[in-house]
């Protein structure tokens, strides 16, 4: 109640300064912290970013790690500066990505590991046991927000790319392909172990629903036809 009254009287900047914090921790905030707040706290302002910085700077690092078929990502705790995920690195905890893991599943994994890592790192920051390390700018990549339009794929693409797209776009916006002018969302897939000697888009099998791609084939385990409900690929 008292904090609410303070918010009414003061700007957020003034409130934070009045609290004289020991440290400011930012997680999945989505905005750049104003420069005037970066050095307000005794131990500075830190950010927990879910990638192996400088790889995947931006708002969708989890999704892009899956979309690109990476087998590993991580939790990076860094000092905030005026840039976008460009501050000095304090601590890195690698996180494995399973072959069929979706972005949603990876989010759950890195959230749990990130929380545990943050609790372990805060005392080390207070004790001065961590040495900030500059990011290697030549290795920097971006992870921009996803859009619905980006979710489309077609079977002229490699099977591995399509599988990664299905995983990476789940739970949002969900990968899809066009069939008879309608969107068919694919919520789960796996790579087929059988070779495909057919044109991309050809149905190789119905049980399980297997489609030929540019190279190899993909099994569509779960689909959602436009205007319909989610169903097994074999039922479509």
Feature map (PLM): residue ranges:
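Short active-site oxyanion
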Residues: 20-24, 151
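An anion-binding loop in the catalytic cleft
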Residues: 155-235
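Short beta->alpha connector loops
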Residues: 8-9, 29-32, 192
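Short, small-residue-biased leader/transition segments that mark boundaries at the very start
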Residues: 2-7
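Donor/substrate-binding cores of folate-linked one-carbon enzymes
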Residues: 23-142
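Active-site-lining helix/loop region of Rossmann-like oxidoreductase modules
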Residues: 120-178
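Short amphipathic alpha-helix with an adjacent loop that forms part of the alpha/beta core around
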Residues: 11-20, 39
